[in-house]
Amino acid sequence: IAYTIWKCKQNADKNVIILGQDQQLYFKQVAAIVEELGYERPDVVHYAFVMLVEGKMSTRQGTVVLLEDFMREAVTKADKAIVEREKVSDIERAKKVAYSAVKYSMEKISTERNVIFDWEQALNFEGDTAPYLLYSYVRINSILSKRDDINELDINYGLLNHPTEIELINLLYDFPKAVQKAKLEYSPHVITHYAFDLAKKFSLFYHECSVLNAEDILLTNARIKLIKCIKQVMENAFDILGLQLVEHM
């Protein structure tokens, strides 16, 4: 109660309490006391349980996993995945991939649903995972490393008329709305769904629309500008979600 009152006195735009679903009665009691003392009732987000594929963690049964051990295991598994793909170990990059994978796996699930954490799925480079998003980001950087010297004041956007390009442009336009929805509803999964959709659309664009070998230089420049915009929005989404960027995958 004292902590909640202290938060009320900080003049923040929002006062939010994050609790497990099993703490709903506790919050009602705290909120009632705070209101009775003359303070504004804080908002609350009730999260469901996080469980491993092996089952629910339980202190009584001795199946609780400490966060420190959990994250250490995540790094080990991420580095193993990197070695399998590249034949070389990279612990620093493994940390970024692992931490991002754990965060994303939990953020992509709506708060009222239990999170079933699966190592194999979380660290997969395909599907709705952080490694897949990071791989898409790295692919964009690879293209830009080969051609980034365009005159952005002389771009013919009318050349971006391929159906996939139009879908990407519309999706980029929707990003602020996705952020606003996530903010108002306290729902980070709105951003994860958006980021995954953007990565999928970019992958389709990558295979359907040549960038460096387009029909002419004007179309190449327009497509370079488009993927620059995709990169910026991806970085913004990753920043909101707390995902760590990597230079290569």
Q: For each predicted feature, which ranges?
A:
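Non-catalytic interaction-recognition regions
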Residues: 1-249
